[in-house]
Amino acid sequence: MSRPAPTPIYTLRGAGGPLNTLHFSCHGGDTPLLYSASGKGAIHIWNLNTRRAERIVEGHSGNSIIWVSTLQAAHTLISQGRDMQVCLWDLSEGRSEVVDSVWTGSVGFCQCSVLETSPGNQLLAFAGQQTEEIKIIELPSKTPVCTLVPDAKVGMVMCIKLWQPDSGPGPLLLAGYEDGSLLLWDVTQRSELSRAKAHPEPVMCLTFDPERLRGISGSSEKTLSSWMLDRQNNLQLQDDVTLVNAGVSQLCIRGDGKLLASAGWDHRVRVFGWKKLKPLAVLQYHTDMVLSVAFSDHQDPRQRLLAAGSKDQRVSLWSIYNEGADTG
């Protein structure tokens, strides 16, 4: 007998706009939170115990917000808007004020990437004013670190991911470009380490597993492309996953490295086993494009959630494959 189709354990409504980005903060503190940011310039901070918005922060002059995250320093929120600004917010003691901002000069949809380098210090990478350039600065000082521009014509930078390898002196950055190329950059040396042509179309999204040195990317086509880094930091293309319908907005790997989720333009979330890319579930709830997916960072694995945000202005939350089920 086949399993019944999964249904959300609950949904969050009232965001008032397409949900471009989601970020969980469930690891520390008393209250598990989910941050969502909309195409109308609002950040909702959802209390997952009450399932209601604890706070709504209006920012970026009503422009679409395309990325939110929290910094390790307590109560600091970081957001990126289509107004070409990255804002740092103080949310401590009930505040909701912008304490600093960074002008990016980019009107594109490339989401920022942030990496903690030491307690209270981060690197922030973002698409720059020129279509192919990536700028990296230190936070909180805003000191410029480098600007990364490819030698070849690869078009606009579409997506980026900073990470710190276990071995090696400094951070690396993965970037997907308009011509379908992936590039690996050495931030310290400001140099390109390797490249691979992963897609015939622009790379819409990518995610990376630093423990396994393995990543996956999506585009407007029906294919997910997986790839890995060898010991010489060369990008090696691996298996492809063929989708039923074209178009992926976002990809996310669960913290334990067992699951991969994709946000589909076909209104569906697809869940795969990350090890072998085995299809596990198709989550159907939304009535428009799914724009964002995120796994929660609960310490207790049984509480882990998958959230999906859609153009239909709703967030769905799912509890799947939490009890040691075979994920392939």
List PLM regions with ranges.
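WD40/WD-repeat beta-propeller blade N-cap
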Residues: L12-L19, E58-I65, V102-F109, V149-V157, ...
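Conserved strand-to-loop turn within each blade of WD40 beta-propeller repeats
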Residues: A37-K40, Q80-D83, A127-T131, G176-D179, ...
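Beta-strand-rich domains and repeat architectures in extracellular enzymes and scaffolds
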Residues: T11-G41
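A structural motif specific to WD40 beta-propellers
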Residues: T7-I9, R52-R55, E97-D100, V145-C146, ...
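Blade-level signature of beta-propeller repeat domains, shared across WD40, Kelch, NHL, RCC1
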Residues: L291-G328
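Loop/turn segments within WD40 beta-propeller blades
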Residues: L22-T31, V68-A74, S113-N121, I160-G170, ...
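A short helix->beta-strand "capping" segment at the edge of beta-propeller domains
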Residues: M1-G17, T50
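WD40-repeat beta-propellers
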Residues: I43-N47, V86-L91, I134-E138, L182-D186, ...
